[in-house]
A protein has these predicted regions:
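N-acyltransferase acceptor-side catalytic subdomain
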Residues: 1-201
Length: 201
């Protein structure tokens, strides 16, 4: 790992020219997608783009996202019950500043990609160190990161990471339910479109 380094970028305009060559196997890490994400990101999200270098050659790219959940309206003003006030206080002070290494907007292994084989020890160390650097960036701004999530690894990657720099990281698994049951009344795609423009009773 001595000759492996990383650099964190705050803007897609600053990304190295070789970025898309490295990310050619993952459209969600290419500059076209990242530029759209940067321009259309929710107001509570900030993206960081991590270039991973061997000597001076770009060999890997990764995405990190900071979410400030205090800005979400759903956690804003609600009723004034004591339980709600306590919950909001705890949330605001202990869980509202979240850093994702990976893409919080989509599911799947879209957090990083390499143009060459890199061992899991090196990858896990780079991800941990880049998270630490981003946490330090926010600390300088007076923002404490409450939660760090390393998101969406393949099963074999997650297992290998647990044996490396992620050995003390709490692991949880969830799989979105992609099952969508169609009402019997939908016989054509027009029925589907109509359902979106029809008011429910």
């Amino acid at each position: 790992m001595d000759n492996i380094t990383f650099k964190i970028f705050n803007s897609t305009a600053a990304l190295p020219l070789q970025w898309d060559h490295v990310a050619q196997q993952n459209v969600f890490l290419q500059t076209a997608y990242l530029s759209v994400l940067e321009r259309s990101a929710p107001i509570n999200m900030q993206c960081f783009y991590i270039g991973i270098f061997e000597n001076s050659e770009l060999i890997g790219v990764s995405l990190a996202q900071y979410l400030n959940l205090n800005i979400l309206e759903s956690f804003g003003e609600r009723d004034k019950r004591f339980k709600t006030i306590i919950r909001n206080y705890i949330f605001k002070n202990f869980a509202s500043h979240t850093l994702f290494l990976g893409n919080n907007m989509i599911t799947g292994q879209n957090g990083y990609i390499f143009s060459k084989e890199i061992d899991f020890e090196c990858i896990s160390e780079i991800l941990r160190k880049s998270a630490d650097e981003i946490i330090g960036y926010f600390k300088q701004q007076g923002i404490a990161i409450h939660l760090v999530s390393f998101k969406d690894f393949y099963e074999n990657c997650a297992s290998a990471f647990k044996n490396q720099a992620f050995s003390k990281v709490y692991e949880f698994k969830t799989q979105p339910n992609m099952v969508f049951e169609l009402p019997a009344s939908w016989q054509t795609k027009e029925d589907y479109y109509t359902a979106f423009s029809t008011l429910l009773p």
